[in-house]
């Protein structure tokens, strides 16, 4: 007999060589019917797994969050099975679960069409309703390679041949379809009920542009119809808010082929950019940061010394000149260390908080570029805090408070923190890591945050905090970071004189709140759906006259607004007033100042706020005061 421990603390005895499914059935038939996979000693396994030793067991159903990835992986296999039935000449390659769904890559001469997706999805529904049994099989490596070659699946044969010797070769069979997979999977295809195929894209085999192009089908799958419908509704809303679409409509920016991944900022977009920079500059000055500016083009010797050349060479833009190799900086940190090293630093100078709106360049693959979210030229709201080890907690608490203030000002209050601790391969002793991790944990707790742990995901040079925002339609965006670094000060020979008179290495805290300004503006465009708050809007007040004989007064109003720092636009054309209001509303301008005969006589304006039909009559001085008060809260 073996002892099996359950999540409720109970321990029950079972005969040896019992399966997880049989245990579930012994507990209740309803649990066995709903069961998808088993968690045995913390590891997910198929329900068919034979248990022959004492263990901890948890039976998982579709209600458990861990099963969402199982459902999506099952859906990927179901997609491949449907494709093979409909298009037998197609070769299958890989199909993992990803965030919010899955994909499967196929090799075929003819691209899939939108009509093909509809047919494939219908076939998937049919196969799901068949509720085919899914079974796991252990194969000999050579036989598996020969088998897949014999059925024309050369990509699968190549994958199996590349698996390290000694690793088991497991295949999963459902109906007439068989696939290489580690698993686990649900016991039958019927668990995949709520899914949709989304799109087709190209993808290189093994992600290498030198290899052949494959056809990638993206899909989404969920545990319930309500979850699927909610996700599709969110995508529909996200499409309306797409920053690339709104960027064109609101005349904020554009991209073009001659400068891939580089933003052409238009007047209104550049206004938003500069306003955000002005806002951040005010915040960091109040929090004791200095601001610096470092070169964009730096000799590769610095990047070699810092370690970036070895790790990021392929992502850097480099050029040869005067027998030297120069590189556009992909990040600011090595340059900030150079400033820190100018002159002798004492413990009294610490902490030293050094910020920069640093222009960086990264050679992103053209296929990875995505509007403002993924660019090749970017400016980070970057800062580095040089401090002593005993100052880490206080500096982290201070940063967390600053970050919270900034996010709140932009309307983000749902902030999640991820804590990445020591990886297996790392610099520094366990004692150093213990102190560093404890300092960050203590700081996060003092700042009032809960955190989730990403075990082993820290950089080799220190633990890391990531700050994730949730937007208006439920999407999550990782923006802020705080990365501790023991290594770069050592590599670049940065030091300070301690109170004892000895030289010590400072700890370096890499930190950003927005990340890149480009990406954060993209997030804001989608968060606000283009309706920027008054202080941030590129045009704060638009002036519209009812008749042309009021134009002189309108120009007087505009001059008064501009003289007081209000960003304005105006329309004094002969067009009808309703047309003018509609046009300004479509441009999502927060305040429209309508001027009629009465407003001219009383030196007033009739204010209509975006999204309302109500009008508020204000003097020009009152209007200026309203906008100024809003601006002064932030700028």
Curated annotation (Swiss-Prot):
Reactions catalysed: tRNA(Thr) + L-threonine + ATP = L-threonyl-tRNA(Thr) + AMP + diphosphate + H(+)
Q: Which residues form the TGS domain?
A: 1-61
Q: Which GO terms describe its molecular function?
A: ATP binding; metal ion binding; threonine-tRNA ligase activity; tRNA binding
Broadest EC class assigned to this enzyme = ligase
A GO cellular component annotated for this chain's UniProt record is: cytoplasm
Which residues are involved in binding Zn(2+)?
Answer: 333, 384, 510
Region span, Catalytic: 242-533
Cofactor(s) named in the record = Zn(2+)
Enzyme Commission code: 6.1.1.3
**Cofactor details (free text):** Binds 1 zinc ion per subunit.
Q: GO terms for biological process?
A: threonyl-tRNA aminoacylation
Q: Which UniProt keywords apply?
A: Aminoacyl-tRNA synthetase, ATP-binding, Cytoplasm, Ligase, Metal-binding, Nucleotide-binding, Protein biosynthesis, RNA-binding, tRNA-binding, Zinc
Compartment(s) of residence: Cytoplasm
Question: What top-level branch of life does the organism fall under?
Answer: Bacteria
Task: List cystine links.
Answer: none
Listed under subunit, the entry gives: Homodimer.
Name the family: Belongs to the class-II aminoacyl-tRNA synthetase family.
Purpose of the protein? Catalyzes the attachment of threonine to tRNA(Thr) in a two-step reaction: L-threonine is first activated by ATP to form Thr-AMP and then transferred to the acceptor end of tRNA(Thr). Also edits incorrectly charged L-seryl-tRNA(Thr).
State the protein's name. Answer: Threonine--tRNA ligase
Q: State the species of origin.
A: Rickettsia conorii (strain ATCC VR-613 / Malish 7)
């Amino acid at each position: 007999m073996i002892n099996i421990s359950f999540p409720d603390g109970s321990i029950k005895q079972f005969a040896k060589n019992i399966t997880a499914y049989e245990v579930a059935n012994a507990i209740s038939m309803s649990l066995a019917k709903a069961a998808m996979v088993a968690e045995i000693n913390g590891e997910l396994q198929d329900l068919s797994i034979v248990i022959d030793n004492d263990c901890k067991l948890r039976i998982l159903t579709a209600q458990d969050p861990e099963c969402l990835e199982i459902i999506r992986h099952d859906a990927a296999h179901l997609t491949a099975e449907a494709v093979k039935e409909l298009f037998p000449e197609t070769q299958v390659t890989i199909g993992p679960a990803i965030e919010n769904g899955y994909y499967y890559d196929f090799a075929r001469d003819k691209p899939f069409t939108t009509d093909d997706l509809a047919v494939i999805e219908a076939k998937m529904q049919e196969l799901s309703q068949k509720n085919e049994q899914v079974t796991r099989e252990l194969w000999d490596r050579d036989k598996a390679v020969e088998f897949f070659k014999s059925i024309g699946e050369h990509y699968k044969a190549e994958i199996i041949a590349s698996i390290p010797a000694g690793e088991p070769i497991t295949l999963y069979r459902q109906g007439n379809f068989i696939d290489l997979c580690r698993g686990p999977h649900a016991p039958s295809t019927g668990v995949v009920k709520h899914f949709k195929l989304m799109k087709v894209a190209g993808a290189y085999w093994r992600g290498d542009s030198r290899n052949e192009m494959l056809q990638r089908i993206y899909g989404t799958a969920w545990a319930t119809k309500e979850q699927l419908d909610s996700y599709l509704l969110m995508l529909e809303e996200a499409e309306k808010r797409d920053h690339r679409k709104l960027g064109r409509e609101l005349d904020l920016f554009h991209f073009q082929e001659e400068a891939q991944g580089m933003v052409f900022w238009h007047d209104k977009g550049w206004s938003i950019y500069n306003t955000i920079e002005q806002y951040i500059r005010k915040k960091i000055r109040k929090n004791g940061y200095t601001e610096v500016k470092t070169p964009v083009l730096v000799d590769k010797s610095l990047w070699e010394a810092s370690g970036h050349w070895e790790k990021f060479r392929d992502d850097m833009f480099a050029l040869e000149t005067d027998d030297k190799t120069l590189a556009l900086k992909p990040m600011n940190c090595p340059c900030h260390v150079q400033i820190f090293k100018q002159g002798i630093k004492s413990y009294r100078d610490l902490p030293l908080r050094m910020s920069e709106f640093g222009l960086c360049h990264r050679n992103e693959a053209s296929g990875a570029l995505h509007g403002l979210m993924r660019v090749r030229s970017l400016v980070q709201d970057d800062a580095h805090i040089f401090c002593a080890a005993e100052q880490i907690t206080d500096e982290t608490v201070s940063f967390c408070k600053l970050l919270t203030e900034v996010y709140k000002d932009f309307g983000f209050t749902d902030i999640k923190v991820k804590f990445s601790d020591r990886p297996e391969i790392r610099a520094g002793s366990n004692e150093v890591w213990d102190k560093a991790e404890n300092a960050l944990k203590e700081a996060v707790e003092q700042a009032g945050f809960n955190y989730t742990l990403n075990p082993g995901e820290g950089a080799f040079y220190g633990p890391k905090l990531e700050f994730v925002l949730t937007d208006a339609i439920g999407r999550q965006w990782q923006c802020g970071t705080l990365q501790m670094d023991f290594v770069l000060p050592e590599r670049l020979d940065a030091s300070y004189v301690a109170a004892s008179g000895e030289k010590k290495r400072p700890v370096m805290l890499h930190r950003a709140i927005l990340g890149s300004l480009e990406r954060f503006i993209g997030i804001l465009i989608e968060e606000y759906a283009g309706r920027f708050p008054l202080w941030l809007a590129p045009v704060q007040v638009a002036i519209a006259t009812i008749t042309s004989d009021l134009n002189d007064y309108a120009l007087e109003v505009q001059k008064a607004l501009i003289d007081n720092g209000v960003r304005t636009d105006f329309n004094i054309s002969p067009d009808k007033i309703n047309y003018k209001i509609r046009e300004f509303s479509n441009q999502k301008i927060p305040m429209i100042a309508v001027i009629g005969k009465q407003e001219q006589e009383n030196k007033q304006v009739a204010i209509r706020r975006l999204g309302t039909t109500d009008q508020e009559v204000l003097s020009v001085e009152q209007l200026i005061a309203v906008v100024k008060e809003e601006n002064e809260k932030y700028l």
